[in-house]
């Protein structure tokens, strides 16, 4: 379960970075 939580956090972080990049450089 802990690994799943870490994976979820990493996924959210990547999504946030992607979103930020699109907004900033879009």
UniProtKB/Swiss-Prot annotation:
Domain of life from the UniProt record: Bacteria
InterPro entries the UniProt entry points to: YrbN-like (IPR049607)
UniProt induction comment: In exponential phase (at protein level).
The protein's name in its UniProt record: Uncharacterized protein YrbN
Lineage: Bacteria, Pseudomonadati, Pseudomonadota, Gammaproteobacteria, Enterobacterales
Gene: yrbN
